[in-house]
């Protein structure tokens, strides 16, 4: 699993984006060029937090949280065939309960 292979630094979070539907409700298939980037996913790894005045600030998100993030946030990476997104905690807009 990716969380054992990736150890984010500082206030970074590794997210597995939600898979998009390949097919619309009406049965039509959506080409890759027409698909929108996902804006939610599951946290698979969390950094230790950022430093502020020589004190480490703990992270607000944890592994397993479902989150919403900005459409163009983070850096897309592929690790062992798994598509992941590395973003800063400040790019996380909300945690989905």
Swiss-Prot record:
Localisation: Cytoplasm
Cellular-component GO terms for this entry: cytoplasm
Keywords: Chaperone, Cytoplasm
Keyword Chaperone recorded: yes
Entry's Gene Ontology molecular function annotations: ATP binding; metal ion binding; protein folding chaperone; protein-folding chaperone binding; unfolded protein binding
Annotated S-S bridges: none
BP-aspect Gene Ontology terms: chaperone cofactor-dependent protein refolding
PROSITE patterns in the cross-refs: CHAPERONINS_CPN10
Domain of life: Bacteria
Subunit structure: Heptamer of 7 subunits arranged in a ring. Interacts with the chaperonin GroEL.
Protein purpose: Together with the chaperonin GroEL, plays an essential role in assisting protein folding. The GroEL-GroES system forms a nano-cage that allows encapsulation of the non-native substrate proteins and provides a physical environment optimized to promote and accelerate protein folding. GroES binds to the apical surface of the GroEL ring, thereby capping the opening of the GroEL channel.
Family matches, as NCBIfam families: PRK00364.2-2 (NF001531), PRK00364.2-4 (NF001533)
Family the UniProt entry places it in: Belongs to the GroES chaperonin family.
Listed name of the protein: Co-chaperonin GroES
Species this protein is from: Gemmatimonas aurantiaca (strain DSM 14586 / JCM 11422 / NBRC 100505 / T-27)
Encoding gene (name): groES
């Amino acid at each position: 699993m990716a969380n054992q292979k990736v150890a984010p630094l500082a206030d970074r979070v590794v997210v597995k984006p939600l898979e998009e539907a390949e097919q619309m409700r009406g049965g039509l298939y959506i080409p890759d060029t027409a698909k929108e980037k996902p804006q939610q996913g599951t946290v698979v790894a969390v950094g230790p937090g950022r430093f502020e005045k020589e004190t480490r600030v703990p992270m607000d998100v944890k592994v397993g949280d479902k989150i919403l993030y900005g459409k163009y946030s983070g850096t897309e990476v592929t690790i062992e065939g798994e598509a992941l997104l590395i973003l800063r905690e400040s790019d996380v807009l909300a945690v989905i309960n």
